[in-house]
C-alpha cells in the first residue's frame, strides 16, 4: 500500500482514493512570464514521478497542473517588453512544454489557464460574497479570513499567531489585516475584465481554487506544490474552496523542499537564478532529472556542478550495465540453472516498490537501481548467460526507468568515450586510495563488461578495448 506524508496532518498516511483505482491530483504550475527556473522544475519532476508510480500500480491518474497567465509579474513584463499579456503567456507556455519535455515530464491530463476560467472565477467570488465569506470594498473584493473557522490548519498556525505582523497596505480597504484579495480593481493600462464588482482581475489564490474545482470537483485526492506555497497560497485555497464547496478541498497535501544554489537560496538579487532553458544547453536533461530525484522530494536539495557531475556518473553506471546486459542477449542460451539471479532481481524489484510505497522515496529507489546494475555487472561475467535471466534483467531495468522517468539510453549513447573511461579509472583510483575496494571492483567489472581491460603499468593504469 502506498503511504504518503500529508502536510495537513503532519504524518504519513495510507493513500485511500476518493474513488477506487483513480487519483485526482492538482499541482500548482508556473506563472508564465519567463522561462522556468530549477525551482519550478523540481515539483514538475517530483510529482511526475508520483504520477508515474501511481500509474505503475494500476491507478488512473487525472493530473491537472495550471498556468498562471494573469498576474502582477506578467503585467510588469508586458510593460517592459511592450507586448500584450496573452502574447507573453503564450510564448512561455510553449517554452514550458519544451523545457519539461526535455526533462521527460509527461504532459498533464489538463493544463488550465486562468484567462479561460474568468467567468468561473467571477461566479465563484459572487458565491463567496453571497454567503458572507467575502465583501466588496473600494472596487476590490476581499475574503473574510476570520469567518472561516479552519484557517491555519494546513500551516499549523492560529489566527492569533497570524495576526502578529499582519498589516493593511496603503490603498487597501480591508475590514481586517488578515483578509486577502479575491478581486483586484483595474488600474489604468492594465489587463482587466468586466465583473459585478467592476472592472478588474482575480487575485492569485482564487485562481487555483476555481481551476481545481472546475477540473476535478469539490474534493480532490492530492494537492501538491512547493513548500513556499504552503502559506499563504494553499492555506487561502483551502479557505476559499471549503467556504464555497462545504466539503474538504483536498484529502492529502504534498510539498516538495527548496532548492539552494551552492548552499545559498536562489534569488535574482544574488545573481544565482538558474533557468532550465540555460542549464540544458550545458547539462544533459536526463542527468538533471536524475540529480533532482536523487534526494527525497521533501528534503532540500543543493544544486552545484560537482553534484550534477556525480549524478552524471551514477546514471552512466546504470546505462552501461543495461547496455552490457543487452550485448549478452545475443549469445544467451536456454540454460535453466541460474534461477538464483531471477530471485535476486525480483527481490530488488520488491525493494524498489517498498521504498516507493514509503512516501515515494526516489533516493532509496535509485540506490536499489544501483544494486540492480551491480548485479547485472556481475552476471555478464558469467561464462554462460540465460535468456530468461537476461529478459528479467531487461524487464526490471525498464520498470525502474519508466517509473523514475529516466531513459535507459542517452540520446546518442554509443560506446564509452575515452574521456569517460579515464574518468572511471580516476574514480577507481580514488576508491582504492580510500580503501573502498567494493566500489573499485564494481568499476573494474563495469569496464570489463564493456570489453575494456585495465592494465597496471609503471606509468599507472592504462586501458585497452577488448
UniProtKB/Swiss-Prot annotation:
Chain positions of motif 'KMSKS' region: 265-269
Binding locations of Zn(2+): 28, 208, 233, 237
Keyword Thylakoid: no
Enzymatic reactions: tRNA(Cys) + L-cysteine + ATP = L-cysteinyl-tRNA(Cys) + AMP + diphosphate
DNA repair is among the record's keywords: no
Keywords (A to Z) from UniProt: Aminoacyl-tRNA synthetase, ATP-binding, Cytoplasm, Ligase, Metal-binding, Nucleotide-binding, Protein biosynthesis, Zinc
A single Gene Ontology CC term: cytosol
Chain positions of motif 'HIGH' region: 30-40
Family that this chain belongs to: Belongs to the class-I aminoacyl-tRNA synthetase family.
Protein name: Cysteine--tRNA ligase
Organism, as annotated: Staphylococcus carnosus (strain TM300)
